[in-house]
Amino acid sequence: MSIDPSRIDIEFDPLRQRMVGVSAHGLLPFDVPFISEITDNLWLGGCEEGLVLPEVIAHLVSLYPWERYTVNHELDSLLEVRMYDSTDQAFEQVDAIASWVNTCRQAAPTLVHCQAGLNRSSLVAARALVLGGMTPDDAITLIRAMRSPACLSNPSFERWLRAL
């Protein structure tokens, strides 16, 4: 196949591109960038196949292996874990992932992503914040303020965090 001689180079910036939809839990509308900075070196977001990962991200934690970022730079670490946004998702692995996130973000910007950056990744990011000394209420409030009120709309995820 030949290349279109009139083709232009287009860059897609996940900090500017937006995801718009309605959450599966609570039917809450959301309009968010693909990734959002929550606090120092902690980024939260969604993914779309082929979206280019910003070079600022050094550590990538993917909770949604069904779609992948295109990574054009060397990552310091990559962790891929299959999680579901369901009310019967088990929580056994959350502490280990959240601890890993805290280790990574001590060194460099770390992105935790799932499909939309609302529930699975918010669960892990909130738990990382709690393990770092924040109260569950403060962690949930921060994530919702910095990302979307639709974050942690999965009732079992929010209930688990608040019960800690």
Residue map of PLM features:
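Short, intrinsically disordered low-complexity segments
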Residues: 6, 15-17, 119, 126, ...
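Charged phosphate-binding loop/patch that engages nucleotide di/tri-phosphates or the phosphate backbone
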Residues: 4-15, 150-164
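A phosphate-binding catalytic loop at a beta-strand-loop-alpha-helix junction
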Residues: 108-126
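Cysteine-based protein phosphatase catalytic domain of the PTP/DSP
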Residues: 23-109, 127-160
